[in-house]
Amino acid sequence: MKRTFQPNNRKRSKVHGFRSRMSSKNGRLVLARRRRKGRKVLSA
């Protein structure tokens, strides 16, 4: 059986990256929430 995690940095950035977060309203809400919580890393 194939494992579920098949690392791929390009896909990682496209799905979870900063620019993809900024491109939608809900993504911006995610970043705002993480800033408020005090996360050192906001996105992948």
From Swiss-Prot:
Belongs to the bacterial ribosomal protein bL34 family. This is Large ribosomal subunit protein bL34. Residues 1-19 have a biased composition (Basic residues). Residues 1-27 are annotated as: Disordered. One of its GO terms (cellular component) is ribosome. PANTHER family: LARGE RIBOSOMAL SUBUNIT PROTEIN BL34M, MITOCHONDRIAL RIBOSOMAL PROTEIN 34 FAMILY MEMBER. Keywords: Ribonucleoprotein, Ribosomal protein. InterPro entries: Ribosomal_bL34, Ribosomal_bL34_CS. The gene is rpmH. Part of the 50S ribosomal subunit. NCBIfam families: rpmH_bact (TIGR01030). GO terms for molecular function: structural constituent of ribosome. Disulfide bonds: none annotated. One of its GO terms (biological process) is translation. Pfam families: Ribosomal_L34.
